[in-house]
Structure formats: C-alpha cells, structure tokens
Amino acid sequence: MKKISLWMLSVGLLCGTACLGSCNRNAEADNADKTAVQDTIEVKKKVGFLAAVDNYLMDSFGSQYSPGSVCIPSVEVIGTNEENPDSVVVWGDFWVFNYNLVGDTLKTVSGGDHPGKMCVVKGKDGKFHVTTFEQVEDGHGNLESAKRIFGDQYEKFHAFNSNEEKREEARVRDLVYFLKVNKLPYKHYQDYGWPARELTVNSEQ
C-alpha cells in the first residue's frame, strides 16, 4: 500500500488516492462544515460494479487514513473482464482521498494509492461486492508484482500511473462527479502547501 504524506502530496501530487497529515485550517469553520456534511450528504454512488469498487475503497482504505469530512475515491479503470456480467474483474489505479469541507473548498487531509486487480461479484441482493483484491506491492516487489497483476495491460497502467497530469485529470473527474450527484456547491480543491484549484463542476465528465 502506497501511503503518502501531505508533505509528499504537496511535492509530488497528484500521483493522485492518499497522504497522511493534516491541513492548516480554521477549526470553527471546519467543525461547522463537518456538521453540515453529516446532516445533508447522502453519498450517492456509481451504479453496478463501479459502485462496489468505490464502496470497497472507502471502507477498506479510506478508514485507514487520517479522517476528514468525506472520503472520495479516484478510480482509473485500466481494463475489465466482463465475460461473466455477474463476476467482473477490474484492473485499475485506485486512489482514496479524505477531505475536509471548508468554505467552498475540499481540503485534502490524507489519502493513498492502491493499484491492483479486483474481482467484483453480484450477490443475492442484486448488488455487486468486491470479493478479492490483489494489490501491487510497495518497495522492492513493486515492479514485479505490477507486471504480474496487470499482465498485458501493464504498459497502459504504467503510462497512466507515471503521468501526473493524467492522474490529476482523473481525480478532478471523480471530484466533479461526486459534487454533481450530491448537488454540492464546492468549487475548489486544495492539497496541503498548494494553492486551491478550481473544479469545473459544469463539466460533462
């Protein structure tokens, strides 16, 4: 699991889902925003197997990082095997970010990257659930495990994962989606040590 400090995010993000640390912020405004979020947000998720991917990332990894007001994954699907529509294999670069909501800005608190392969199966309840997740290793085994897990899709994964601009585009895309489906007014996001960046909430992404 690739954990990233907020300091590292400020130096090297977006490599994209998250860093450990805390944002400088006004505590009173922060608490007010957290309360508002808890009272008003019903997190609406993507449909089908992508909903299960988001849920898994939030539940399994978002909770491991320093908490924020809201957890928003960033998922770049590298490839899928949907031969069996009730048992889908998803290869992806999976990021998780926790944010505090301050004014009109999503302020990054923590997050990390969890690339790998998920098996997502439709249960008796008609909903998809992640049943297995094989994650790329950190450190010495990183390259070998990435090539093994992604197979002939490794080059596609590497091209995305090593491209900061592409990672940032994917992150913004998923932030915009989250804001749209939840009808939230936030217009910017901000990583620690960086100026706030505008979110194009009217985008059709």
Regions found by a protein language model. Give the residues of each.
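Positively charged n-region of N-terminal signal peptides that target proteins for export
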Residues: 1-4
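Sec-dependent N-terminal signal peptides
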Residues: 7-14
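C-terminal motif of bacterial Sec signal peptides marking the signal peptidase cleavage site
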Residues: 18-22
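N-terminal export/targeting and maturation segments
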Residues: 27-94
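Mature extracytoplasmic domains of secretory-pathway proteins
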Residues: 79-140
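Low-complexity, intrinsically disordered terminal/linker segments enriched in charged
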Residues: 131-205
